[in-house]
Amino acid sequence: MAEAEVKDNEVYEEDLVDYEEEVENGTDGGANAANASADVVKKGYVGIHSSGFRDFLLKPELLRAIQDCGFEHPSEVQHECIPQAILGMDVICQAKSGMGKTAVFVLSSLQQIDPVAGQVGALVLCHTRELAYQICHEFERFSKYLPEVKVAVFYGGVHIKKHKDLLKNDCPHIVVGTPGRILALAREKDLSLKNVRHFILDECDKMLDSLDMRRDVQEIFKMTPHDKQVMMFSATLSKEIRPVCKKFMQDPMEIYVDDEAKLTLHGLVQHYIKLSEAEKNRKLNDLLDALDFNQVVIFVKSVSRAAELNKLLCECNFPAISIHSGMTQEERLTRYKNFKEGHKRILVATDLVGRGIDIERVNIVINYDMPDSADSYLHRVGRAGRFGTKGLAITFVSSASDSDVLNQVQERFEVDIKELPEQIDTSTYMPS
């Protein structure tokens, strides 16, 4: 079968979209806080979040290709997976069809691959010819400005000599195929897998559920180097098959999407504290004194509270930095880079950074103000431990409405969030 032209797929990109966030005067419990800054007019702003692929620090060539497609708004799966995937981390992800999971491994592979003549650097396996064909063309679409990167697809139904000739005369850097054909080429030494650095299974449960196909995948896997990135994706991923997937991986980042297409994160220690509004500042001070952390993000509900709390923390000898919509885009970017580079350990922020801020060293999130929904809560606390490391989330509960949201979180995500104990084991939230 001859390779055809590219077909559409749901991959998204945007030019930093405008949002609005609440502007409110005063910190209700800020007895020790400085006076509020001048009123800030509620307005649109350009957000520092990964609502566009540019915030993932992708190659300009990839961003240009995405922009050419005219896609916007990365899906939640892309928000959560891509920052980990482009760093070479093992990933296991369950996401419904149409949620853009293909883009995760296509973009992350293209971002990382260093093409060397005659060497296959990335291998993608899937269970059908049609899917292999589609994936190959997604690679071609997004590598259109990376002419040095060669992609090829191999599957049954095509005379194997054609594939052998291609491998001999114009060896691709990225190979997509079905296990049977890939294994045949590898066994006959036409396809060398000794330089593969990215090993990807799409619709992995379909391949690993079938014993025959699983044997093929295992044999192929053993032909690749031990030191490589492994990513697995599927539209359905039962609890029974997940342990099988993990046998191929080392401490993978796990992301699962439920029936309502919302994101569920795992492995985060979560607690709440019941207190009055006036007690928040003192309790926050105590927590920052008592907890061990690399970096911490403190979420508040408005621009004025972010500015106030940041000033208060600095006055209390906690070197903090804040990001909110009352700043220019340039100032927000500068502050974000300062925090990302570790110049500051404490970030006070609004929901402006509730999505897509991916900083490996952040291991604690504190909800100084309760978010307004379970989904917002999820995205906030997901800032901690985002690269497979341990994390801790602490939420202040000071009103009946706060309790309502906390209950919604527990019901929605089937998680039991307990009150913060007097003593908490550092090993539960600090990377070893």
From Swiss-Prot:
What are the GO cellular component annotations? nucleus
Which Pfam family, any one, appears in the UniProt record?
Answer: DEAD
Per UniProt, the short sequence motif DEAD box occupies residue numbers 202-205
The keyword ATP-binding is annotated on this UniProt entry: yes
Q: Where in the cell is it found?
A: Nucleus
Motif stretch (Q motif) = 51-79
- Coiled coil start-end: 1-28
- What keywords tag this UniProt record? ATP-binding, Coiled coil, Helicase, Hydrolase, mRNA processing, mRNA splicing, mRNA transport, Nucleotide-binding, Nucleus, RNA-binding, Transport
Which residues are involved in binding ATP? Answer: 95-102
According to the UniProt entry, the note on domains is: The Q motif is unique to and characteristic of the DEAD box family of RNA helicases and controls ATP binding and hydrolysis.
How does it associate, per the subunit comment?
Homodimer and heterodimer with AIP2. Interacts with API5.
Protein family: Belongs to the DEAD box helicase family. DECD subfamily.
Q: Please give the name of this protein.
A: DEAD-box ATP-dependent RNA helicase 56
